[in-house]
UniProtKB/Swiss-Prot annotation:
<protein>
    <recommendedName>
        <fullName>Protein NifX</fullName>
    </recommendedName>
</protein>
<keyword id="KW-0535">Nitrogen fixation</keyword>
<keyword id="KW-0614">Plasmid</keyword>
<dbReference type="GO" id="GO:0009399">
    <property type="term" value="P:nitrogen fixation"/>
</dbReference>
<comment type="similarity">
    <text>Belongs to the NifX/NifY family.</text>
</comment>
<dbReference type="GO" id="GO:0051540">
    <property type="term" value="F:metal cluster binding"/>
</dbReference>
<dbReference type="InterPro" id="IPR034169">
    <property type="entry name" value="NifX-like"/>
</dbReference>
<dbReference type="InterPro" id="IPR003731">
    <property type="entry name" value="Di-Nase_FeMo-co_biosynth"/>
</dbReference>
<dbReference type="InterPro" id="IPR013480">
    <property type="entry name" value="NifX"/>
</dbReference>
<dbReference type="InterPro" id="IPR051840">
    <property type="entry name" value="NifX/NifY_domain"/>
</dbReference>
<dbReference type="Pfam" id="PF02579">
    <property type="entry name" value="Nitro_FeMo-Co"/>
</dbReference>
<dbReference type="InterPro" id="IPR036105">
    <property type="entry name" value="DiNase_FeMo-co_biosyn_sf"/>
</dbReference>
């Protein structure tokens, strides 16, 4: 049985995104460091990040997770769908690793997965994302921003 908990500061509903912000999810075991693979993440810290700063939105927690080898205690149990569903509304997903089938489902939910090689403090991930928004974002991020309605896509921009 998959179990999910939503911990938020104000309400138990999905909060509307702050105007001009990207909603990002960070895979974590301890709510302090980006240190989890997508499938084995016990928590996802969700933030709205804009050029001006960031706001904590919610923590989504799971009781039953895969180990980092991808093995499930109960074979055949779907552990991907509840996580993808819980991240609905996010634009970026930062994680240590993500398998092909999971990545395909995340992308089809219009969430851009970003693999980070080494553990990194959540505050550093937020700062780096904010810096990318303040400066000239790379083409892949401009595309995400346009799809999220955060920035207008100019007709002369490349689709790289």
């Amino acid at each position: 049985m998959n179990s999910v908990r939503r911990l938020s500061l104000v309400t138990d509903e999905i909060q509307p995104r702050r105007s001009g912000a990207l909603r990002i999810a960070i895979a974590t075991q301890d709510m302090k460091v980006l240190n989890a693979h997508f499938g084995s993440a016990k928590h996802f810290a969700v933030y709205d990040v804009s050029r001006d700063g960031w706001d904590f939105v919610e923590a989504v927690s799971f009781d039953d997770v895969s180990d980092e080898s991808g093995k499930h205690p109960i074979e055949g149990e779907d552990r991907i769908t509840p996580k993808v569903t819980a991240l609905t509304g996010c634009h970026l997903l930062f994680c240590r690793a993500i398998g092909g089938p999971s990545a395909a489902r995340v992308v089809s939910a219009k969430i851009h997965p970003i693999r980070v090689g080494e553990p990194e403090a959540i505050q550093d991930v937020l700062s780096r994302t904010q810096k990318m928004l303040k400066t000239a974002p790379p083409p892949w991020l401009r595309k995400v921003l346009a799809q999220a309605g955060v920035a207008e896509k100019k007709p002369f921009e490349d689709e790289d």
